[in-house]
């Protein structure tokens, strides 16, 4: 990936941060119901990296996520990631994630995530820059209302990351990531008489600062802090008539503390 392409993507990312995160499309005359919330969350992950070939590796990881100020278990994730780096400046990634998500006090629901990514890499001085474009498909293992929740739900994730190389065991990094919906449900006037319509908008901005600590050639840890600015649009319909009763905009600011451990074979 050339330096000009990386710079263009940086400009696009900055523009999107300014104009795309807070805007809401005018969709109908139905009232807009807005809500906002904040939360403290934590993530703990252990991973095993297995080299398959010179430029190919497989990573198996298990992760726990908490929410509600660390008081509730939110998700349990099992992931298998295949990483292929045929060239110095370009790599590819495929991933499957089994998600067990808590809904309510005792109800757990299953989701399947499928990720495909292209990663461009560029070194500038002591900084290693990378631009990752990832498409994610989320398949829910339960029945959904297509006017409210598409299944699968598709998003595009754009991440710009900078790692700082130095002679110590610590390798600090920062990154910004945008989530863009590709098939979010759009509000329709009547769910009984109108076809399903799709919309796309930026529904999350993620900012992260952290550092990887190399323990030895086989063991490493990662410590990070992230802040998520989430915004999701939705719609409510009258159960009897199917008429659009309101549009919803939910905003959540989540502060996330994470600790990862990885063992390399």
How does the language model describe each region?
Residues 28-34, 56-70, 75, 91-102, ...:
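Transmembrane beta-strand segments that form the barrel wall of outer-membrane beta-barrel proteins
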Residues 46, 79-80, 116-118, 158-160, ...:
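Membrane-embedded beta-strands of outer-membrane beta-barrel proteins
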Residues 1-31, 265:
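Bacterial Sec-dependent N-terminal signal peptides
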Residues 52-60, 88-94, 125-129, 169-172, ...:
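Repeated loop/turn-to-beta-strand initiation elements of outer-membrane beta-barrel proteins
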Residues 133-240, 263-265:
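Outer-membrane beta-barrel transmembrane domain signature
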Residues 72-128:
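Hydrophobic/aromatic-rich structural module bridging two neighboring secondary-structure elements via a short loop
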Residues 38-42, 74-76, 110-114, 150-156, ...:
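Residues that define the transmembrane beta-barrel architecture of outer-membrane proteins
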Residues 115-118, 213-217, 251-265:
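Outer-membrane beta-barrel "beta-signal"
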